[in-house]
Amino acid sequence: MDSLISNTAAINGLLARFGVKFGIYKNGEFHEQLFPYDSLPRIIPADEFAEIEAGLIQRVDALNAFLRDIYTEKRIVADGVIPEDFAFSSSGFLPACDNFVPPNGIYSHISGIDLVQAKDGTWYVLEDNLRIPSGASYPLIARKLARRASPETFKNNSVDRNDDYGLLLREAMESVNPDRKSTRLNSSHSRKSRMPSSA
């Protein structure tokens, strides 16, 4: 762990060299800035992570159910759960998609759910990003560089892998491909059985 922390500057230097950046809008203008790496990891026990994961799966399934309803039967509006003006005047509502049902009824295939943890340890959802969530590559390259900088940290601790993300993403996309044949991919540490229907 000490070697990981001591190599923070070197890891951030490599991230800058590789051009790992993220974009933000400020005062109506788009800006890019380097992705900062914090070498002190947030350690989440396996049982707690499993509970968070189950909650996120449930949440994404609920969000997809909401999108299916808002573009088809619109019961959530008819029942007065949300006002009609609020739903259909939103910049995120796409009239061209009205009455459109994608394969398997999945509207959001990749979801970026931002989480925060309170002082008492409770996790909260900060926001749901369903349009074009970015940032999947950040933990992948950060983990790769961290392993290179401090291999003993990962050797001496049980750390869940994340390098099968590409395989899981492909499986998720293949699952909603109406023309697919049997294309299931095999990963030695695949977590497919725990994936939500919308990935």
What are these regions (language model features)?
Residues 1-199:
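Preference for protein termini
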